[in-house]
């Protein structure tokens, strides 16, 4: 009941609760599909339009919901091992409609066809036991090219009537407003971190991300909060090596060939408890814009024949083991993406309204966390005999929720 205070009315809260449950249990995770599977008590059925209004149009705030969500999750990450916040972005595919908010056409290199997708910037916190989404922000659509083309086509050499001048000025101001309102993925990531640090629910959590969101503004903000970060960098990044600016790949190759002994063998315990062997070279170097940072070059084979991984951190006192162990917390956010897309309806909502899309992503995060907290049944079932006593698979949790839902219908 921690989320009840977010909603104005009991009926609205009940509709949202049904929607979250439907995101986990319904095969069709749209509101239409969820509503179609609800078994209403006699005399209590409401229209689908009423449920739609309660979930997507009522006066509750998705921002307040996520603040409550983050505050509710915070105790789960205290005293249960190290916690690290991961930052990333993902694509939510909508191949059948360009009218969904934020969906834009692009070529899908996986399926080798044109498709539509939303760009969603996410943040997730992870410890050795679980991973939870903390933020999901959809990138607003960018229509600058179309608007600029329209302005070029409708341009006139002179305007005889004041009404024409006012109309043209209004069009130019709208274009300027949209241009200023355009937000890059990296800017959205900075805003998310600023919000997380302002709330202060995860004071001990460092950050891990890759070069897709790495910017000077982001690292400066994290460092100003007294925290550390680890990021993978591209192999063409320039570093100051022996008095000259060189690409990190040009630094790594001579080291591998001429001084293989500089790569120290280490055994690192990763986030999931797995022990991994690495061969690492670590040194504090200077980078353009970022200043002095620790560079760690990682190989995972003893003969150094694999492609190296280049990690960068502001923690100058960390060794290669600590840096790589922190970097292992970057991958749970990929698990969160898969989890949310396949089990919590991240890509299911066919909504054209900006507020409705944001609410759906927030409720998907809530559903993903709710599933991890569900109590388990059926330990002695043959279906789950592969799991030991300490494991509680996601399938078993969904099985428990489905049984509870059926039991409520029967009763």
Can you describe what each PLM-predicted range is?
Residues 89-91, 319-351:
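Short amphipathic alpha-helical "interface-anchor" segments enriched in bulky aromatics
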Residues 346-403:
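Basic, amphipathic alpha-helical segments enriched in Lys/Arg and hydrophobic/aromatic residues
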């Amino acid at each position: 009941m921690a989320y009840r205070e977010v909603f104005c009315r009991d009926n609205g809260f009940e509709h949202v609760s049904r929607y979250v449950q439907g995101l986990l249990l319904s095969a069709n995770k749209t509101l239409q599909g969820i509503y179609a599977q609800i078994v209403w008590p006699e005399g209590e059925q409401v229209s689908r339009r009423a449920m739609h209004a309660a979930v997507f149009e009522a006066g509750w705030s998705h921002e307040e919901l996520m603040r409550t969500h983050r505050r509710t999750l915070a105790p789960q990450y205290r005293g249960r091992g190290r916690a690290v916040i991961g930052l990333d972005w993902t694509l939510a595919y909508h191949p059948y409609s360009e009218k969904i908010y934020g969906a834009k056409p692009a070529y899908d290199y996986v399926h080798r066809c044109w498709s539509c997708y939303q760009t969603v910037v996410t943040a997730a916190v992870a410890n050795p036991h679980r991973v939870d989404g903390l933020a999901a922000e959809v990138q607003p659509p960018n229509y600058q090219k179309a608007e600029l083309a329209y302005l070029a086509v409708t341009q006139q050499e002179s305007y005889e009537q004041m009404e024409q001048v006012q109309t043209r000025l209004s069009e130019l101001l709208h274009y300027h407003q949209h241009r200023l309102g355009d937000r890059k993925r990296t800017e959205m990531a900075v805003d998310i971190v600023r919000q997380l640090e302002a709330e202060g629910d995860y004071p001990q959590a460092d950050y891990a991300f890759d070069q897709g969101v790495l910017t000077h503004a982001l690292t400066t903000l994290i460092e100003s909060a007294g925290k550390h970060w680890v990021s993978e960098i591209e192999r063409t990044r320039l570093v100051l090596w022996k008095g000259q600016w060189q690409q990190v790949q040009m630094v790594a190759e001579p080291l591998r060939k001429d001084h293989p002994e500089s790569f120290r063998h280490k055994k690192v315990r990763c986030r999931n408890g797995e022990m991994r062997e690495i061969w690492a070279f670590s040194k504090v170097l200077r980078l353009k814009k970022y200043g002095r940072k620790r560079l760690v070059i990682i190989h995972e084979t003893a003969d150094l024949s694999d492609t190296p991984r280049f990690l960068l951190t502001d923690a100058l006192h960390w060794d290669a083991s600590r840096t790589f162990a922190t970097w292992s917390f970057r991958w749970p956010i990929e698990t969160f993406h898969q989890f949310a897309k396949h089990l919590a309806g991240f890509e299911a909502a066919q909504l054209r309204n900006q507020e409705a899309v944001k609410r759906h992503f927030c409720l998907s995060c809530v559903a993903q966390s709710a599933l991890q907290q569900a109590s388990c049944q059926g330990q002695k079932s043959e279906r789950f005999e592969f799991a030991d006593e300490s494991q509680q698979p996601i399938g078993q949790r969904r099985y428990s929720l489905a049984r509870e839902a059926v039991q409520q219908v029967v009763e």
